[in-house]
Amino acid sequence: MEARTLDQLPGWARALLDEGRVARLGLVDEAGTPRVLPVTYAVYEGAIWSAVDRKPKRPGEPARVRYLRRRPQAALTVDRYSDDWSELCWVQALGRVEIIGAGSAPEPLEVLGAKYVAYREEPPPGPLLKLTPERLICWRAAE
């Protein structure tokens, strides 16, 4: 099934997106090579937000931020795996990513903090990534 906005997703797909703990962010690096990164995320006001957190990274601007400055299109996938394959499902959001400076969007950071204890204890210092879906695709085995 496809949708244009988060509100158009079927209930099971929206619940998966809201309750999921880890997403996979697909983007393209400077050489044109596809990359997929696990990210934490939260849904807020029609967009999917992720933060560049305090986990160890190389010095300088994080690679994902560099890649998205160059090519701001990305795909984010949240899935549920089960050994009972009748329970398999996923939601994918494709769209443009905005890089929002640290401290410029306190509300999404609060939503991330409500979802992830580590963010409440030590808020992420880096920028926020705001993916605004242009297309959403969802699938589940039970249909």
Model segments located where?
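Short coil-to-beta transition motif at edge beta-strands of beta-rich domains
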Residues: 71-73
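Short beta-strand segments
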Residues: 21-57, 76-79
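Short solvent-exposed loop/turn micro-motifs enriched in small/polar/acidic residues
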Residues: 18-20, 33-34, 90, 122-124
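Short, conserved active-site entrance elements at the starts or edges of catalytic domains
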Residues: 1-27
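Structural motif corresponding to alpha-helix initiation and N-cap regions
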Residues: 10, 61-62
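Charged, gly/pro-rich active-site loop segments
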Residues: 1-11, 81-143
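Short gly/ser/thr-rich secondary-structure transition/capping motifs
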Residues: 57-59, 112
